[in-house]
UniProtKB/Swiss-Prot annotation:
Phylogenetic lineage: Bacteria, Pseudomonadati, Pseudomonadota, Gammaproteobacteria, Enterobacterales
Annotated gene: yhbP
InterPro entries: Split_barrel_FMN-bd (IPR012349), UPF0306 (IPR011194)
Entry similarity comment: Belongs to the UPF0306 family.
Name the record gives this protein: UPF0306 protein YhbP
């Protein structure tokens, strides 16, 4: 199994992302339920335009964040650190992402918040189930070189 497939399988089983944005010397983090898109290597989430993190992001911004489980022992630790770009989706792109998101999280139908995409450009996956401190790395540029 290649690195991206292993990371993608794990991300698809999780549902909460923490991401951080930076604007004019200020940092802010947020959490949300997400849907992983393996084809585009992206996370889709809903967040209101009036939130601090959305206003700091504007239409598009660099982002870093994490996805992690809550294991009870060190040997079961698995988690992702990432960097990428967050952007607010519009039009057909937004409609398609919302439809997929609502299939996974039907309760979100009551939320009028816009859909955002976090395009993952670099991922470090720590997976202690493969051995203590085992890390898998993926770069978007490396995928283009392998294709």
């Amino acid at each position: 199994m290649d690195t991206l497939t292993a990371i993608g399988r794990w991300l698809a089983k999780q549902h909460v992302v923490t991401w951080c944005v930076h604007h004019e010397g200020e940092l802010w983090c947020a959490n949300a339920f997400y849907l992983f898109d393996a084809q585009n290597v992206a996370l889709y989430l809903l967040t209101d335009d009036k939130t601090r993190h959305a206003q700091m992001s504007g239409a598009c911004a660099p982002v870093a964040g994490t996805v992690n489980g809550q294991p009870k022992t060190v040997t079961r630790i698995r988690g992702v650190q990432f960097k990428g770009v967050i952007r607010r989706l519009e039009g057909q792109e937004s409609d398609a992402a919302r439809k997929a998101y609502l299939r996974r999280f039907p309760v979100a139908r009551v939320l009028p918040a816009p859909v955002w995409e976090i395009r993952l450009d670099e991922i470090k996956f720590t997976d202690n189930t493969l051995g203590f401190g085992k890390k898998l790395h993926w770069l978007r540029d490396s995928r283009a070189q392998q294709a």
